[in-house]
Every structure is written in structure tokens, then in C-alpha cells.
Amino acid sequence: VQSMDKLKAIAEKSGLKQFVVKTPENSTESILQQTALNYMKAADMLETFGVRLLLHNEAGDIQTKIAGKTAYEHLLDLCMGKVGAQVDVGWVQFGGEDPAAFLERNAARVQSVHHKDFGAGREPIDVPVGTGNVDLAACFRFAQSRDIPQLVDQEHFDSDVPGELQ
């Protein structure tokens, strides 16, 4: 309860409308079920002061499959609509899925799109957004057509970041 009071104070002071959490490191069925219960409880509490809880993905929860779905999608299913999706398209791509198709498949629950881009290869090497292997134009169109908030994770700074975002 104390932590929820702190989150409420932060949200009220800053105008935040979303808090983002991630999937657990070990995506087993039992861990995901317990995580879903915890996240739904937190989402219910956050909702009382107008804040939505979102789930962010990593590559591992896209690569891991449970019941024919990614562990990320399975956890969202277990949360029964109480937790929205913040899809990191770079990690979706690196996890082996097509980001645009993944967004479309999960359109009803995507509340935020997190743009990140990686170069080709087996390692997730951050590159300037728009210069890597993610079809960011399709991801931008998806979010813009639905008025979904977007954020750009630009960790590669030795170039013209504003120019690259155009």
C-alpha cells in the first residue's frame, strides 16, 4: 500500500497516465500465472487514480512459446485485459517475430509502441532508428492510425538524431 501511495503521488505530481512493467526473466506457466495475479492487483489499484499499467516485452518473452503463443502474449492473456501492452518493436524483431504483424495481431491491447532498431546479426546492436532491420515505417503507421502513444529509444547518439527521426 505504501508503494501505491508513492506511485499515486508521482502520477499526480507529474501527470503520468501509464506505468510500465516487464515480464519475469523465467517465463514458465506457474511464474506467469503468479505474475498475472500480481499485475492485475496492481492494475486495479493504479486504475483508482487514473493510471494504466502496461507490460513491456523483451526478446526472450517473444522467443519463449507457451500454449502456442509468445510468453508475452500469454501473460497478457492471463491478465484478462487489466494490463495493456507496450510493444518494443526492436525486441519483437530480435525475438523472431515480424513487428508490424505482431502489432496487428495484438492491436486490441497495444497502448504504447516503443521504437528501437537493431543492426543485422545475432547480437542486439543498437543503431540509429530507421537504419536497422526493423520496418519502423509500418510500426509508425500502425500507431499513428490508432492514435497510440509512441516513444523512441535512441541509444546510438553519434549522429543526427532529429534528422534520423524524420
Regions found by a protein language model. Name each.
Residues 1, 23-26, 51, 58-60, ...:
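Active-site beta-loop-alpha junctions enriched in small/polar residues
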Residues 2-84:
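Active-site acidic/histidine proton-transfer and metal-coordination neighborhood
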Residues 12-15, 66-84, 91-166:
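Histidine-acidic metal/acid-base catalytic patches
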